[in-house]
Amino acid sequence: MIWHRQVPLKVSVFAWRLLRDRLPTKSNLIYRGVIPTEAGLCVSGCGALESAQHLFLSCSYFASLWSLVRDWIGFVGVDTNVLSDHFVQFVHSTGGNKASQSFLQLIWLLCAWVLWTERNNMCFNDSITPLPRLLDKVKYLSLGWLKARNASFLFGTFSWWSNPLQCLGIG
């Protein structure tokens, strides 16, 4: 279910690793003896141990992207602290048809990817991107991914940013 024809392969591989807790999060690096326990705090500065569950679902900074995305696409939240359950609930949250589930799958994969790349940006470049800019990145990349695989997708940035479901004919 993480494999999606409109999502770059590297993002699907990343999600596959994420859902199996195989990313090099600080908690995994501590477990493998790569870094000391003292170096395991979340890069956002929230004070919690950086695990995949924390980073993507509980961190006060990173997890906030999900609510911004839900507001953008216009549906209610997902209530779980387990990544695999979050993925399934997010994709099936509208109870809609295959097209809406495919779109939500693409958005979930993209959000996770944006969060991970931002985590790496904070960790290795000591740079913080404001959350509204991360949402803009989700909007921009999702439009680009859809246009790259579908030449007949003619909607522009303004239409997409305003109402993506209407652009896809599912809203």
Named regions from a protein language model:
Residues 1-49, 171:
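Helix/loop segments that flank and initiate small ligand/metal-binding modules
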Residues 130-143:
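Short secondary-structure subsegments characteristic of cysteine-rich extracellular domains
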Residues 45, 49, 119-127, 142:
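Residues that mediate protein self-association or partner binding, especially
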Residues 147, 151-171:
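C-terminal helix/juxtamembrane-tail motif
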Residues 2, 32-85, 89:
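Short Cys/His-based metal-binding microdomains
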